[in-house]
Amino acid sequence: GTLLVAWWQREAPFVAWQMLVIDAQAYALTLLVNDLTKWASGRARPWVRNGDCATNRDSPSCGGGGRNLSFYSGHAAVTATSAGLLCAHHTQLSLYQNDYLDTGTCVLAVLGTAVTGAMRIASDNHWASDVLVGHLMGYASGYLLPTLLYYKEFRAAPHEHRDSLEYAALPLVGDGVLGVTLMGLF
């Protein structure tokens, strides 16, 4: 929908193309990180521990390759990515040129992902923590990443001259190394 609004209503096909590339990048990141995390963690789904599988591992409902792919919820991550992208595009570009409609679109998208998460928990497919982490990861790749990378309001403007030292502590992970490194700008 937002691509069509940018393309036809706003008559900005290049903006629509840029949004499509941003969306593809966000979804690719979401799916890649989600799949890697699911396979690395191997967390059992609630129905494996609480349902028929808890007492009878040979039950037909215990079959399938997704038994230990609970963490974190891909449905929550993808819907949160969608909501994040909608919010980023609508709040940064004012696609409808109406603050109420653009904000309303964002709110409805966030409500939609919340309902999806609640349904994943209620259906015994995910633990609440699976859904919470899925939402956080989805919003990070759908809203935070595009906003920081592509929308100038969140990017720090370059400084001609720094009056003070700015520094940050960053994690340091390497082959046999785990620690913290200090990075500074002056």
Regions flagged by a language model, labelled:
Residues 1-8:
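Long, hydrophobic/aromatic-enriched structural stretches that serve as scaffold segments
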